[in-house]
Amino acid sequence: MAETTKIFESHLVKQALKDSVLKLNPVYMIKNPIMFVVEVGMLLALGLTIYPDLFHQESVSRLYVFSIFIILLLTLVFANFSEALAEGRGKAQANALRQTQTEMKARRIKQDGSYEMIDASDLKKGDIVRVETGEQIPNDGKVIKGLATVDESAITGESAPVIKESGGDFDNVIGGTSVASDWLEVEITSEPGHSFLDKMIGLVEGATRKKTPNEIALFTLLMTLTIIFLVVILTMYPLAKFLNFNLSIAMLIALAVCLIPTTIGGLLSAIGIAGMDRVTQFNILAKSGRSVETCGDVNVLILDKTGTITYGNRMADAFIPVKSSSFERLVKAAYESSIADDTPEGRSIVKLAYKQHIDLLQEVGEYIPFTAETRMSGVKFTTREVYKGAPNSMVKRVKEAGGHIPVDLDALVKGVSKKGGTPLVVLEDNEILGVIYLKDVIKDGLVERFRELREMGIETVMCTGDNELTAATIAKEAGVDRFVAECKPEDKINVIREEQAKGHIVAMTGDGTNDAPALAEANVGLAMNSGTMSAKEAANLIDLDSNPTKLMEVVLIGKQLLMTRGSLTTFSIANDIAKYFAILPAMFMAAMPAMNHLNIMHLHSPESAVLSALIFNALIIVLLIPIAMKGVKFKGASTQTILMKNMLVYGLGGMIVPFIGIKLIDLIIQLFV
């Protein structure tokens, strides 16, 4: 699922070519009125090729009319090819998912406690099944008994198994995943054909994809332009009669196709499908295309601190000795107290100790694990003891043993806390040696990412349960714009509503049942696949890898989708305007000599001008397919900067490219005339 599919893989291209021909069916083509106009023109050109006197006009060269027919046919095939290729990529992903839905048996538990083996497809909602090591979970369900590790790699692409148990936030299992160890009893929660995987396949294939509001608005604009250009073309016929100029039906057909926005009309559907495809490449399930587009309008991101901005594991950052001890002695004691500590904090202390270039000898001793009661861990050697733990617990231990508390210890502990860190006090026997500074580490690359989002006009808000001082320290280090300290789940809803009241589009992440109301309230809610079912139902995006930082990726994909559609629309309309001024002077120059002043391209003849424009019109669709599929590339910048850049590249470029392309094609046509 997480693998990236190349745009022009041979098997996808072959299937897309077949599908692009099948899509020529008028019943299908009428769904895209712009391209349907092209198909009507193609059929009229075919009719004029077979019956030159079809409209009782002066006969026109059959070769010329047939050339128009072929070019229009290729235009339709190319437009259909872009859509078929985008759909093919989705189907390829769906097939990969469908491979996990192999025929399997289920061990259903009967009311008397005995088992019966049945086909998984016969399971109904409410049935209870037992799944043991190496077996696949037959359908979506809820763990009601047992504890096991479950391999979800077939669905999420994540190789590390996850622990599932009854109760809490980790009792939901997905059909098609397998039990890696132990056993589970699962209550089926979905009917056959309506599982999470079935819905995922349907969404990836685009079967339930509907046009988004932005697509509908753009489509309305394109249809309006199409009608306007068709009216212009129809008025040309009586104008030509008045000027005693022979304007054939074939030329009118070709001219109409050249001027209506066929480029974006042929690529519009592919852009939308490809946008959904890019989201699935990140292992994110979008419930609708609208949710992806909404991401493009997001201007406020609400992010949890733990797991999203920070790694969530406190890491050793510094050793700070008290005045009565030495740095070397503190490092050795911290190392000894942590060498058998397999927690992330313990491993980070050992790693930091190695970096101090001090001789660290390992003695044999009895490891004392951390408990909630003692709040410390350490090692008992034959002649001494070494511990590390919470300041209060360590001070209490020393006092009870009649030891001495260093006068500067309190200042060291408070200093670490003010920086947003967690202090651990280290002692040897009953002597306090110093403090280990544990720091909640900011994830790599986030500072740059937040800067990029800020340049794009997106505000980041960090929500954390930490106190004001700790929250301020981490917010400053990470580079977020604002923070909400001592934030409870219900406070997130208030933050979302406040931002929405200002007219902002808000996105947030969550995974627990208590996050569900906020996920539903936000304009874009990204739920973790490892989270509760209520969170996943409330959200409109689900991250199969359960990585909260992906919300930023989805926002960028949404912006890229909107930019791609806008850029190619600008390019297409600019193309149409350029073709208008490139073709008309060449066509009417004989009847209206004054038009010669506008004939800056000096095309060979009216016929070659029309054919050149038609060929360019068809080829430009093919050339723009990679951009439609991959999206317009952009770097973090303000909306105004991006708009100006795209207007320059796709607006001005859309005006210049047709003049160059049509002239080159005209020169090639002259070689064969």
From Swiss-Prot:
Membrane disposition: Multi-pass membrane protein
Keywords associated with the record: ATP-binding, Cell membrane, Ion transport, Magnesium, Membrane, Metal-binding, Nucleotide-binding, Phosphoprotein, Potassium, Potassium transport, Translocase, Transmembrane, Transmembrane helix, Transport
EC number: 7.2.2.6
Reactions performed catalytically: K(+)(out) + ATP + H2O = K(+)(in) + ADP + phosphate + H(+)
Residues that, per the record, bind Mg(2+): D511, D515
Residues passing through the membrane, by range: 34-54, 65-85, 216-236, 253-273, 581-601, 609-629, 649-669
Localisation per UniProt entry: Cell membrane
Protein's job: Part of the high-affinity ATP-driven potassium transport (or Kdp) system, which catalyzes the hydrolysis of ATP coupled with the electrogenic transport of potassium into the cytoplasm. This subunit is responsible for energy coupling to the transport system and for the release of the potassium ions to the cytoplasm.
SUBUNIT field: The system is composed of three essential subunits: KdpA, KdpB and KdpC.
Name of this chain's protein: Potassium-transporting ATPase ATP-binding subunit
Protein's gene: kdpB
